Amino acid sequence: MTLNGWMQIALYGAVVLALVRPLGGYMTRVFDGERTLLSPALAPIERGLYRVSGIDARQEQTWLAYAGAMVLFNVAGFVLLYALLRLQALLPLNPADQAAVAPDLAFNTATSFVTNTNWQSYGGETTLTYLSQMLGLTHQNFVSAASGMAVAVALIRGFARASTKTLGSCWVDMTRATLYVLLPLCTVLALFYVSQGMPQTLSPYVEATTLEGAKQTIAVGPVASQVAIKMLGTNGGGFFNANAAHPFENPTALSNFLQMLSIFVIGAALTNVFGRMVGDERQGWAILTAMGLLFLAGVTVTYWAEANAQGVLSNLGLTGGNMEGKEVRFGIAASALFAVITTAASCGAVNAMHDSFTALGGLIPLLNMQLGEVIIGGVGAGLYGMLVFVVVAIFVAGLMVGRTPEYLGKKIEAREVKMAMLGILCLPLMMLGFTAFATVVPDGLAGPANAGPHGFSEILYAYTSAAANNGSAFGGLTANTLFYNTTLAIGMLVGRFFVKIPVLAIAGSLAAKKRLPASAGTFPTHGGLFVGLLVGVVLIIGGLTFFPALALGPVVEHFAGAAGQTFATGG
């Protein structure tokens, strides 16, 4: 570990914190329907979209109607994307003459991008046309991110409102998230990425002759526009197979820093939106502090593990840390920081190969996802995921002191706790259930490239990533098979919608309740005690659930490596 590495980490944290209040204030005005700096240009477009779509922006929805609209929109998006992938060979903007995507891969890919997971069992430059990348994937990157933001805002309204049945309009919230937040920021980001050397073209792939006289095909395309929303919307799916490790997808150290910043900025700012909308910014800062503590712990362990490379590498006398699978232009610090950011925020983009990390270095990205992607998390999804843990933490605190649990003046009763636990427990069911299944059937065992505990970790990481809607992978797993394409897609769907719908049910229940005045016995939820309780609940409920599985994978791999034991390649 070096001073330069810690300075990079400190600078990143400082810039994120500096952007929380300005962006949080702006998004609060957007979702409250107030005038913003961009309103003169965008308000007419917004009204035009409502008029064309037949939407009454003043008509609000109950939680059930809100959930129904969201599910309907996502089903329509899935059907259109699946059709586009299956028919891409017949459609224009196919300069590389790509064939139609196979049915099981198209099902997996459509599910992946609709659920904001962006798991990729394919290489983008060898599988998809420009039209599929732009109209299919980039479009879903925008609307899946907007969908997560809309659900988060609906839950915030549940806490902020009283004695009402409505949570706002799903259509209006998604439109405003896309039009006022995502599109303007992505326009600026895409232009910046082009200035750094990122391609943005519809020209065919370039044929080049190497110094040895061999022919080489250099893939290009509309990269910058997709990368902008891939990071900002915490989607993560790469235009190229190497993702952000590819020089065309992440050309410079500056583009790398901005991509990391893009991943966290909206999720962090949404905590400020929460504080503003409930009338007490301290509530948002408390939640952000809990997220920050978990993030800092993860960065510290990962950076230490990769910089020291304990185990087999140190036994071989290597002293420069673990550089396998990392870009020399980024180094260990930026690679470790990126890995923790992308798995804390359910993004899944990578600038280094997580499969090549040390056992402990790979454990932290895995644990980040298993905690429920609540350390900043995906845009919207991170906040509503953490608020689900807040409900459980408040319930636990109430049990300990013998009082009816309250949060922001709302009683936390059996219905809210049941919905919260449904949202929490569906993730380990998918992650651990499918992992166990894959380790006892031939189709599952054929996937990992490594034997022993690391092979198990490759399977566990895949299903964890899918259910957590992250999308990153231990690349040694051969996932483009009927078995993995199908089971991973099921995990993505359950991980997305079996969390979203209970969250909206909680929002509807809370919005209908009266607000109780604070009393001397009210548990303060903006101080250090609450932050500690929240972190403890996240670690106990999220972490301990997965400890046996982690012990079979990265933990035993670490101790085996320290003893000099290696395992043969092959499943």
Swiss-Prot record:
State whether keyword Transmembrane helix applies: yes
Q: Name one GO molecular function term.
A: potassium ion binding
Q: Does the keyword Chloroplast apply?
A: no
Subcellular location(s) per record = Cell inner membrane
Q: Which Pfam families match?
A: KdpA
Q: Name one GO cellular component term.
A: plasma membrane
List the transmembrane segments: 5-25, 64-84, 136-156, 179-199, 220-240, 254-274, 285-305, 330-350, 375-395, 421-441, 488-508, 527-547
Classification via InterPro entries: KdpA (IPR004623)
> What is the membrane topology listed in the Swiss-Prot or TrEMBL record?
Multi-pass membrane protein
Q: Which UniProt keywords apply?
A: Cell inner membrane, Cell membrane, Ion transport, Membrane, Potassium, Potassium transport, Transmembrane, Transmembrane helix, Transport
Under NCBIfam families, the record lists: kdpA
Give the record's subunit note.
Answer: The system is composed of three essential subunits: KdpA, KdpB and KdpC.
Its biological purpose: Part of the high-affinity ATP-driven potassium transport (or Kdp) system, which catalyzes the hydrolysis of ATP coupled with the electrogenic transport of potassium into the cytoplasm. This subunit binds the periplasmic potassium ions and delivers the ions to the membrane domain of KdpB through an intramembrane tunnel.
What protein family is recorded? Belongs to the KdpA family.
PANTHER family to which the protein is assigned, alphabetical: POTASSIUM-TRANSPORTING ATPASE A CHAIN (PTHR30607), POTASSIUM-TRANSPORTING ATPASE POTASSIUM-BINDING SUBUNIT (PTHR30607:SF2)
Q: What is this protein called?
A: Potassium-transporting ATPase potassium-binding subunit
Origin organism of this chain? Methylorubrum extorquens (strain PA1) (Methylobacterium extorquens)
